[in-house]
Amino acid sequence: MSEFELLAQDLLEKAEAEEQLRQENDKKLLGQVLEIYDQKYVAELLRKVGKNEWSRETLNRWINGKCSPKTLTLAEEELLRKMLPEAPAHHPDYAFRFIDLFAGIGGIRKGFETIGGQCVFTSEWNKEAVRTYKANWFNDAQEHTFNLDIREVTLSDKPEVPENDAYAYINEHVPDHDVLLAGFPCQPFSLAGVSKKNSLGRAHGFECEAQGTLFFDVARIIRAKKPAIFVLENVKNLKSHDKGKTFKVIMDTLDELGYEVADAAEMGKNDPKVIDGKHFLPQHRERIVLVGFRRDLNIHQGFTLRDISRFYPEQRPSFGELLEPVVDSKYILTPKLWEYLYNYAKKHAAKGNGFGFGLVNPENKESIARTLSARYHKDGSEILIDRGWDMATGETDFANEENQAHRPRRLTPRECARLMGFEKVDGRPFRIPVSDTQSYRQFGNSVVVPVFEAVAKLLEPYILKAVNADSCKVERI
């Protein structure tokens, strides 16, 4: 072969290798996007930036390897990249590492990422919540692990596995981290596991008392990985759940694990561990926050959640400011549903009960909504937006046509995102890739984001102190 023929062959082989690599990267990129958005929606968008005849079927065949490899155009590639979340501004220079357990849609994560943290592990079982999480939070494939079932990591559903083996497995599969975040579910502690382990001569302590609950999984990870700091979140009723037994087991466990819990002795009406979201946004939403410091680091002195008031906004947004100017009519209650809720509230009011809808006047700058719940998708009754319904006319002539035009409406998912603090009215939109029903569940199960942004700011100097203390220990070793 001549010199140029050899060159041509070499260039061809190089081009084919580059093309193959690009096709593999394009397929990987598409796969990441399809973990969040449905195929039909993505195909529609791709058709708008090029001449390729994309469809749900062509995407499905490509991603499943049932057709010849494809190469995206530059416009198509850019579109798909824009559909994924951007890395935080401080990437890749992170100040500390954290993990996000029972993550939901990332409400606790945001504050800790904002102060310079890197999320290296996320666990969330609900696949629809995972879609929303992945739509909004950057997850570096090289540094981050996603888990759908925490029990697969802790082996808590395999009682036959010896404890030492379980801890070794956790240590291998959960990345090292400085801060552990967890919004675990509230569950009663059963004595069944205790008696079984006693009969087997197994260890006492939290390994017995907390078995069978998802808090047990959190405790196992804390014991195995020994993070410097943890932040646990739960409903306010955790303190009184099961006549206080649940909370006692949790606090005893955290003490057994070697942690000082901030404000642990405070249990009364003004317990600083119970934080109401109304201080940050116009929604009454009380949550208990447990902040723990590893005892051997001796860094907990001076920390109290009472100081969170330092981060209250000077001017809390009013309820009306969070609303969209124009919404789809589907969010207005139907005459039948409004009549049902109206009569239901009247019936219980007559009995002296407080059950009923929560009507919020958006014109009143002091209005505070009730707690948004995961069942909001059913009827929206806990937070209804007043659209000018005349109560007096409603009492005498409920079917009055003019008054019926002012039936209340429920919040839109976008307004829920604002009420929970996932987005600001003039800020970057929070991406909602799921149905209204799913989004209502997700926001109703979440936390008021600014509360945990404030907790993160309060903790920032302690986290940096912990990182420094841990690194000094490693150097001495």
Swiss-Prot record:
Q: What broad class of enzyme is this?
A: transferase
Any one GO MF term held by the record is: DNA (cytosine-5-)-methyltransferase activity
Q: Name one GO biological process term.
A: methylation
- Which residues does the entry assign to the active site, renumbered to this chain? C186
Domain SAM-dependent MTase C5-type positions: 96-466
Q: Does the keyword Transferase apply?
A: yes
Query: Which InterPro entries does the entry link to?
Result: C5-Methyltransferase (IPR050390), C5_DNA_meth_AS (IPR018117), C5_MeTfrase (IPR001525), C5_meth_CS (IPR031303), DNA_meth_N (IPR040743), SAM-dependent_MTases_sf (IPR029063)
Reactions catalysed, as given in the entry: a 2'-deoxycytidine in DNA + S-adenosyl-L-methionine = a 5-methyl-2'-deoxycytidine in DNA + S-adenosyl-L-homocysteine + H(+)
Q: Provide the alphabetized UniProt keywords.
A: DNA-binding, Methyltransferase, Plasmid, Restriction system, S-adenosyl-L-methionine, Transferase
Report the sequence similarity comment from the record: Belongs to the class I-like SAM-binding methyltransferase superfamily. C5-methyltransferase family.
Listed NCBIfam families: dcm, PRK10458.1
What name appears for this protein in its UniProt entry? Type II methyltransferase M.EcoRII
Species source reads Escherichia coli
- The primary gene name is ecoRIIM
